[in-house]
């Protein structure tokens, strides 16, 4: 299925009775082929989704709530289109379930089937909400740089590195990532953390490159994979990890992580803008 066939950007009838058919899968393949990624992926990782508007009824009709977190493996053949995900989660609102575990297992089954891979699901109950603390990305802020730029479409030629010098290890951070939904044109605001080992990347060029996504249209996952691939090709790091966290829309935030070396999956930290 293509994004144009999805419910995104179209009037939708909201249902409050559970309906797994609302989930709309989109194949990762086409977007990856467009940037030169074939069947052999140059990375592994996960997409972390957080859903803040999940509610259902218990067996006695009393509303229940939870914050849901989903871990979608980067090698899954599909992603779930975000509006369909919102509609699907909304369909739980007037449906009775025996327990929170039943809700979790139902969501895990449905979303895994839609993505074509096993998706991990965690539900945070209200008594645990106090543990959901805000954090910020660790690393050197690129946003401190005072620079000029007029490039607002992705341009990998902005990326340079000291290829003839000794390798370094750095973690660089920017809150200036912005792209746009390819279906609705709505802005997607994000923060990005880039950790690498290799030739030192020119900081000003990297910041200009991140800013160059400002008028780009692409889903969150696609943007992060393009950033990963462009940095890998232009700057030739031995190790590279890219983690972006986007602000929520429709009660959902999406946070893709890609790496080419063994790392634990990143913390599902909530940034201030999320």
Swiss-Prot record:
Q: Where does substrate bind?
A: 80-82, 220-221
Where it sits in the cell: the answer is: Cytoplasm
Q: What class of enzyme is it?
A: oxidoreductase
Question: What are its GO biological-process terms?
Answer: queuosine biosynthetic process; tRNA modification
Top-rank taxon: Bacteria
Extract the Pfam families matched here: QueF (PF14489), QueF_N (PF14819)
Q: What is its main location?
A: cytoplasm
Which pathway does it operate in? tRNA modification; tRNA-queuosine biosynthesis
Gene Ontology MF term list: preQ1 synthase activity
Catalytic residues in the record: 181 (thioimide intermediate), 188 (proton donor)
Which family, according to UniProt?
Belongs to the GTP cyclohydrolase I family. QueF type 2 subfamily.
Q: What does this protein do?
A: Catalyzes the NADPH-dependent reduction of 7-cyano-7-deazaguanine (preQ0) to 7-aminomethyl-7-deazaguanine (preQ1).
- Name used for this protein in its record: NADPH-dependent 7-cyano-7-deazaguanine reductase
- Organism, scientific name: Paraburkholderia phytofirmans (strain DSM 17436 / LMG 22146 / PsJN)
Lineage, please?
A: Bacteria, Pseudomonadati, Pseudomonadota, Betaproteobacteria, Burkholderiales
């Amino acid at each position: 299925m293509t994004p144009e066939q999805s419910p995104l950007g179209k009037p939708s009838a909201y249902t409050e009775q559970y309906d797994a058919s609302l989930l709309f899968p989109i194949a990762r393949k086409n977007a990856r082929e467009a940037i030169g990624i074939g069947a052999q992926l140059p990375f592994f990782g996960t997409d972390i989704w957080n859903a803040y508007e999940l509610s259902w009824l218990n067996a006695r009709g009393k509303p229940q709530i939870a914050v849901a977190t989903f871990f979608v493996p980067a090698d899954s053949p599909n992603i779930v289109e975000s509006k369909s995900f919102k509609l699907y989660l909304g369909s739980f609102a007037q449906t009775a379930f025996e327990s929170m575990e039943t809700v979790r297992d139902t969501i895990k089954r449905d979303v895994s089937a839609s993505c074509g891979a096993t998706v991990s699901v965690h539900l945070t109950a209200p008594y645990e909400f106090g543990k959901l603390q805000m954090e910020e990305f660790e690393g050197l802020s690129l946003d401190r740089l005072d620079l000029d730029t007029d490039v607002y479409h992705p341009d990998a030629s902005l990326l340079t590195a000291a290829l003839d010098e000794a390798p370094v290890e750095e973690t660089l951070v920017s809150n200036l990532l912005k792209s746009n939904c390819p279906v609705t044109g709505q802005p997607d605001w994000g923060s990005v953390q880039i950790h690498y080992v290799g030739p030192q990347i020119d900081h000003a060029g990297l910041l200009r490159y991140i800013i160059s996504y400002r008028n780009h249209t692409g889903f969150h996952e696609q943007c992060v994979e393009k950033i990963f691939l462009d940095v890998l090709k232009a700057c030739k790091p031995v190790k590279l990890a890219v983690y972006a966290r986007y602000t929520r829309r429709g009660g959902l935030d999406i946070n893709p992580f890609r790496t080419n070396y063994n790392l634990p999956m990143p913390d599902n930290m909530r940034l201030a803008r999320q």
